[in-house]
Amino acid sequence: MNAPHKPVLLNEVLESFKDRKGTIVDATLGYGGHSEALLKSNPDIKIVGIDQDSEAIAFSKQRLASYGDRVQIIQGRFADVIEDILQTHDVQGVLADIGVSSLQLDKKDRGFSIHSENLDMRMDQNAELSAYHVVNTYDEEELKRIFKEYGEIRHSGKLAKAIIHNRPIQSATQLAEIAQKILPKNKRVHPATTLFQAIRIEVNKELDQLKGLLDALERHKPKGAKVAIITFHSLEDRIVKQHFKEWAKSCICPPEAMRCTCGANHALGNIVTKKPIVASIDELEENPRARSAKLRVFQFKE
């Protein structure tokens, strides 16, 4: 069966989990690229795959069917189901690829792309909140907030006013045209890219989901487990970096303390990747969409 989506940093993910025996949670199963490669590379691995996209779930069930009981697939948001998985499985690894798949971007009816005919952007097609709802019903202050927080857009107020003035906005292309008139031009990417990112994050509550996953891992501290997270923009990467940094701290005394009184034995594990791993030149030539991908890995103590 032809894979519709190239998994990013695949070799680096395989390297991260090559010594694992037991359950790997693929928190963003998607079209099964990372999971299939992990199953092929290591007969001692079992996969629990999670995704909220029903199209991706159907594809991955078929793609991974030959692996039988080595694979369990759950439909849902990873932050909502990870707690139960950590309680019921011997989790030896967690992988999360926090991004939109190529297929989601390329399918115009999903509304993720600036070239889409509609405004949707829901990863879970059954969810109530869509990009259309955000763009056409949020007030000016709400729009300004998500543009500033999730897109780090400097002209968030001006953009919010323009969107409200042009309502109703029916398509992604119409929204992109409005953004193009307001936002500074960029040689590398379309001016509307960060706007679409901000709306997508709001629709899918992506940062809340990421924080929920990390908080659950911190609570359960799965012994010896490796956590590998791929991010595609600075907001997500900052969250992962900060959590890993806090987890690796031995001393938790307040900064103003003159000397350590906590015992300096509070580290949950160690950061495996001192700097984020990025795509190789060869991968970028084959898959330009990997250009902004960053992989960070943490390992909990035994």
UniProtKB/Swiss-Prot annotation:
Record's function text: Specifically methylates the N4 position of cytidine in position 1402 (C1402) of 16S rRNA.
Keywords assigned by UniProt, alphabetized: Cytoplasm, Methyltransferase, rRNA processing, S-adenosyl-L-methionine, Transferase
Gene Ontology terms describing biological process: rRNA base methylation
Family per record: Belongs to the methyltransferase superfamily. RsmH family.
This enzyme's EC code(s): 2.1.1.199
Pfam families: Methyltransf_5
Protein name: Ribosomal RNA small subunit methyltransferase H
SUPFAM superfamilies from the UniProt entry: Putative methyltransferase TM0872, insert domain, S-adenosyl-L-methionine-dependent methyltransferases
InterPro entries: RsmH, SAM-dep_MeTrfase_MraW_recog, SAM-dependent_MTases_sf
HAMAP family associated with the record: 16SrRNA_methyltr_H (MF_01007)
Catalytic activity: cytidine(1402) in 16S rRNA + S-adenosyl-L-methionine = N(4)-methylcytidine(1402) in 16S rRNA + S-adenosyl-L-homocysteine + H(+)
Major subcellular site: cytoplasm
CDD domains recorded: AdoMet_MTases (cd02440)
Positions that bind S-adenosyl-L-methionine: 32-34, 51, 78, 97, 104
Cited PANTHER family: 12S RRNA N4-METHYLCYTIDINE METHYLTRANSFERASE (PTHR11265:SF0), S-ADENOSYL-METHYLTRANSFERASE MRAW (PTHR11265)
GO cellular component terms attached to this protein's record: cytoplasm
Domain of life the protein comes from: Bacteria
Organism for this UniProt entry: Nitratiruptor sp. (strain SB155-2)
Enzyme class: transferase
Subcellular location as annotated: Cytoplasm
GO MF, one example: rRNA (cytosine-N4-)-methyltransferase activity
